[in-house]
Amino acid sequence: MTHPQQPHGPLRSFGRLKSRPVKPRQQALLDTLLPQIAVPTAPFQPRDLMPEAQEVWLEIGFGGGEHMAAQAGKRPDVLMIGAEPFVNGVASAVRHVEEQALKNVRIHEGDARDVVGWLPDASIDRLFIMFPDPWHKARHNKRRLVQPAFVAELARVLKPGAGFRFATDWADYAQWTVERVLADPAFRFADAEAVRNAPPADHVTTRYEEKKLGDCAPVFLDFVRI
Protein backbone atom coordinates (compact mmCIF):
# COMPACT_ATOMS: atom_id res chain seq x y z
CA MET A 1 0.00 0.00 0.00
CA THR A 2 1.32 3.45 -0.86
CA HIS A 3 0.54 6.59 1.03
CA PRO A 4 -0.02 9.97 -0.65
CA GLN A 5 1.89 13.05 0.37
CA GLN A 6 0.98 13.96 3.92
CA PRO A 7 0.47 17.54 5.14
CA HIS A 8 3.00 18.51 7.76
CA GLY A 9 1.38 21.64 9.10
CA PRO A 10 3.45 24.75 9.77
CA LEU A 11 6.32 23.01 11.59
CA ARG A 12 9.49 22.37 9.63
CA SER A 13 12.12 19.97 10.92
CA PHE A 14 14.90 21.91 9.17
CA GLY A 15 16.20 25.45 9.20
CA ARG A 16 17.14 27.82 6.39
CA LEU A 17 17.13 26.43 2.85
CA LYS A 18 20.13 28.32 1.48
CA SER A 19 23.17 29.88 3.14
CA ARG A 20 25.27 31.20 0.26
CA PRO A 21 25.14 31.54 -3.53
CA VAL A 22 25.52 28.26 -5.39
CA LYS A 23 28.70 28.06 -7.47
CA PRO A 24 28.18 28.22 -11.25
CA ARG A 25 29.35 24.64 -11.84
CA GLN A 26 27.08 23.32 -9.12
CA GLN A 27 24.16 25.34 -10.47
CA ALA A 28 24.77 23.79 -13.88
CA LEU A 29 24.57 20.33 -12.31
CA LEU A 30 21.37 21.30 -10.49
CA ASP A 31 19.92 22.34 -13.84
CA THR A 32 21.09 19.32 -15.85
CA LEU A 33 21.99 16.32 -13.66
CA LEU A 34 19.49 16.68 -10.82
CA PRO A 35 16.41 16.31 -13.08
CA GLN A 36 17.88 13.03 -14.37
CA ILE A 37 18.32 11.53 -10.89
CA ALA A 38 15.40 13.15 -9.09
CA VAL A 39 12.93 11.01 -7.16
CA PRO A 40 9.35 11.16 -8.51
CA THR A 41 7.18 13.60 -6.59
CA ALA A 42 4.34 11.11 -6.23
CA PRO A 43 3.99 7.54 -4.92
CA PHE A 44 6.60 5.35 -6.61
CA GLN A 45 8.20 1.92 -6.53
CA PRO A 46 11.93 2.25 -5.69
CA ARG A 47 12.79 -0.77 -7.84
CA ASP A 48 11.48 1.09 -10.89
CA LEU A 49 14.32 3.59 -10.42
CA MET A 50 17.00 0.87 -10.56
CA PRO A 51 15.58 -2.56 -11.44
CA GLU A 52 18.90 -4.34 -10.90
CA ALA A 53 19.33 -3.05 -7.32
CA GLN A 54 19.86 -5.74 -4.71
CA GLU A 55 18.74 -3.44 -1.89
CA VAL A 56 17.24 0.02 -1.42
CA TRP A 57 18.75 2.39 1.16
CA LEU A 58 17.43 5.78 2.28
CA GLU A 59 19.35 8.69 3.80
CA ILE A 60 17.23 11.43 5.35
CA GLY A 61 18.93 14.83 5.46
CA PHE A 62 22.19 14.01 3.68
CA GLY A 63 23.79 17.41 4.26
CA GLY A 64 26.62 17.87 1.76
CA GLY A 65 26.19 14.35 0.44
CA GLU A 66 29.58 12.96 1.51
CA HIS A 67 28.14 10.09 3.52
CA MET A 68 25.51 9.24 0.91
CA ALA A 69 27.99 9.28 -1.97
CA ALA A 70 30.56 7.20 -0.09
CA GLN A 71 27.98 4.57 0.86
CA ALA A 72 26.72 4.46 -2.72
CA GLY A 73 30.26 4.14 -4.03
CA LYS A 74 30.99 1.18 -1.77
CA ARG A 75 27.76 -0.58 -2.77
CA PRO A 76 27.02 -0.04 -6.47
CA ASP A 77 24.46 -2.86 -6.23
CA VAL A 78 22.37 -0.75 -3.82
CA LEU A 79 19.94 1.99 -4.84
CA MET A 80 20.67 4.94 -2.55
CA ILE A 81 17.81 7.43 -2.18
CA GLY A 82 18.64 10.69 -0.44
CA ALA A 83 16.45 13.58 0.68
CA GLU A 84 17.70 17.04 1.63
CA PRO A 85 15.84 20.40 1.73
CA PHE A 86 18.99 22.54 1.85
CA VAL A 87 19.86 23.82 -1.65
CA ASN A 88 23.59 24.09 -0.98
CA GLY A 89 23.64 20.51 0.29
CA VAL A 90 21.87 19.22 -2.80
CA ALA A 91 24.30 21.18 -4.99
CA SER A 92 27.23 19.55 -3.19
CA ALA A 93 25.64 16.11 -3.49
CA VAL A 94 25.09 16.29 -7.24
CA ARG A 95 28.75 17.30 -7.58
CA HIS A 96 29.75 14.13 -5.69
CA VAL A 97 27.48 12.07 -7.95
CA GLU A 98 29.02 13.58 -11.07
CA GLU A 99 32.65 13.40 -9.93
CA GLN A 100 32.34 9.79 -8.74
CA ALA A 101 30.20 8.75 -11.73
CA LEU A 102 27.62 7.24 -9.39
CA LYS A 103 24.76 5.52 -11.19
CA ASN A 104 22.88 4.33 -8.10
CA VAL A 105 21.91 7.61 -6.40
CA ARG A 106 18.49 9.25 -6.58
CA ILE A 107 17.77 12.58 -4.86
CA HIS A 108 14.77 14.46 -3.54
CA GLU A 109 15.33 18.18 -3.02
CA GLY A 110 12.84 18.86 -0.26
CA ASP A 111 11.26 17.48 2.88
CA ALA A 112 12.17 13.83 3.49
CA ARG A 113 8.77 13.23 5.04
CA ASP A 114 7.28 13.57 1.57
CA VAL A 115 9.53 10.81 0.23
CA VAL A 116 8.66 8.54 3.15
CA GLY A 117 4.98 9.17 2.47
CA TRP A 118 5.38 8.20 -1.20
CA LEU A 119 7.24 4.95 -0.47
CA PRO A 120 5.43 1.60 -0.41
CA ASP A 121 5.24 -0.51 2.71
CA ALA A 122 8.35 -2.58 3.50
CA SER A 123 10.39 -1.12 0.64
CA ILE A 124 13.59 0.07 2.39
CA ASP A 125 16.45 -2.21 3.47
CA ARG A 126 18.49 0.35 5.40
CA LEU A 127 17.93 3.86 6.76
CA PHE A 128 20.36 6.61 7.79
CA ILE A 129 19.53 9.81 9.68
CA MET A 130 22.92 11.40 10.29
CA PHE A 131 23.25 14.51 12.45
CA PRO A 132 19.83 16.09 11.83
CA ASP A 133 19.00 19.60 13.01
CA PRO A 134 18.92 19.19 16.83
CA TRP A 135 16.48 22.00 17.63
CA HIS A 136 18.16 21.88 21.02
CA LYS A 137 16.17 24.64 22.73
CA ALA A 138 13.29 23.09 24.67
CA ARG A 139 10.68 25.30 23.03
CA HIS A 140 11.83 24.04 19.62
CA ASN A 141 11.90 20.31 20.45
CA LYS A 142 8.56 19.87 18.71
CA ARG A 143 10.33 20.63 15.43
CA ARG A 144 12.67 17.66 15.73
CA LEU A 145 12.39 15.14 12.95
CA VAL A 146 12.12 12.20 15.34
CA GLN A 147 8.53 12.28 16.56
CA PRO A 148 6.24 9.30 17.29
CA ALA A 149 4.16 9.73 14.13
CA PHE A 150 7.26 9.87 11.94
CA VAL A 151 8.81 6.86 13.67
CA ALA A 152 5.62 4.97 12.84
CA GLU A 153 5.97 5.98 9.20
CA LEU A 154 9.57 4.77 9.20
CA ALA A 155 8.39 1.45 10.60
CA ARG A 156 5.92 1.22 7.73
CA VAL A 157 8.48 1.66 4.95
CA LEU A 158 11.31 -0.39 6.49
CA LYS A 159 11.46 -4.10 5.76
CA PRO A 160 11.55 -6.52 8.70
CA GLY A 161 15.20 -6.83 9.68
CA ALA A 162 16.14 -3.48 8.12
CA GLY A 163 18.79 -1.42 9.91
CA PHE A 164 18.19 2.15 11.07
CA ARG A 165 21.22 4.25 12.04
CA PHE A 166 20.82 7.61 13.77
CA ALA A 167 23.71 9.89 14.72
CA THR A 168 23.85 13.14 16.67
CA ASP A 169 26.32 15.21 18.66
CA TRP A 170 23.66 16.50 21.05
CA ALA A 171 23.25 14.33 24.15
CA ASP A 172 19.62 15.31 24.69
CA TYR A 173 18.68 14.42 21.11
CA ALA A 174 20.34 11.01 21.46
CA GLN A 175 18.25 10.26 24.55
CA TRP A 176 15.15 11.72 22.90
CA THR A 177 15.61 9.43 19.90
CA VAL A 178 16.22 6.30 21.96
CA GLU A 179 13.03 6.92 23.94
CA ARG A 180 10.83 7.59 20.91
CA VAL A 181 12.16 4.88 18.63
CA LEU A 182 12.07 2.15 21.28
CA ALA A 183 8.58 3.26 22.32
CA ASP A 184 7.44 1.94 18.94
CA PRO A 185 7.07 -1.86 19.17
CA ALA A 186 8.38 -2.18 15.61
CA PHE A 187 11.95 -1.34 16.70
CA ARG A 188 14.66 -2.71 18.97
CA PHE A 189 18.37 -2.05 19.43
CA ALA A 190 20.49 -3.83 16.84
CA ASP A 191 22.88 -5.42 19.34
CA ALA A 192 24.71 -4.93 22.63
CA GLU A 193 26.80 -2.14 21.07
CA ALA A 194 23.88 -0.28 19.51
CA VAL A 195 24.74 2.92 21.42
CA ARG A 196 28.33 3.98 20.89
CA ASN A 197 30.63 6.97 20.60
CA ALA A 198 33.17 5.22 18.40
CA PRO A 199 32.15 5.44 14.75
CA PRO A 200 30.87 2.13 13.32
CA ALA A 201 33.23 0.40 10.91
CA ASP A 202 31.22 1.45 7.85
CA HIS A 203 30.72 5.07 8.94
CA VAL A 204 31.85 7.93 6.72
CA THR A 205 32.80 11.15 8.54
CA THR A 206 31.24 14.32 7.15
CA ARG A 207 32.27 17.96 7.24
CA TYR A 208 29.40 18.74 9.60
CA GLU A 209 30.54 16.07 12.02
CA GLU A 210 34.09 17.46 11.97
CA LYS A 211 32.83 20.91 13.00
CA LYS A 212 31.85 19.55 16.44
CA LEU A 213 28.94 21.94 16.87
CA GLY A 214 27.09 19.83 19.44
CA ASP A 215 27.47 19.46 23.19
CA CYS A 216 28.93 15.93 23.19
CA ALA A 217 30.99 13.51 21.17
CA PRO A 218 29.04 11.92 18.32
CA VAL A 219 26.57 9.27 19.44
CA PHE A 220 25.69 6.50 16.99
CA LEU A 221 22.46 4.57 17.51
CA ASP A 222 21.70 1.39 15.59
CA PHE A 223 18.14 0.05 15.57
CA VAL A 224 16.51 -2.85 13.75
CA ARG A 225 13.01 -3.05 12.33
CA ILE A 226 11.44 -6.09 13.97
From Swiss-Prot:
It comes from the Bacteria. The active site is at D133. GO terms for cellular component: tRNA methyltransferase complex. Residues 1-21 are annotated as: Disordered. The keyword tRNA processing applies. Substrate binds at K137, D169, T206, R207, Y208, E209. S-adenosyl-L-methionine binds at E59, E84, D111, D133. GO terms for molecular function: tRNA (guanine(46)-N7)-methyltransferase activity. It catalyses: guanosine(46) in tRNA + S-adenosyl-L-methionine = N(7)-methylguanosine(46) in tRNA + S-adenosyl-L-homocysteine. CDD domains: AdoMet_MTases (cd02440). Pathway: tRNA modification; N(7)-methylguanine-tRNA biosynthesis. Residues 139-144 are annotated as: Interaction with RNA. Keywords: Methyltransferase, S-adenosyl-L-methionine, Transferase, tRNA processing. Catalyzes the formation of N(7)-methylguanine at position 46 (m7G46) in tRNA. Belongs to the class I-like SAM-binding methyltransferase superfamily. TrmB family. This is tRNA (guanine-N(7)-)-methyltransferase. It comes from Caulobacter sp. (strain K31). The lineage of its organism: Bacteria, Pseudomonadati, Pseudomonadota, Alphaproteobacteria, Caulobacterales. The gene is trmB.
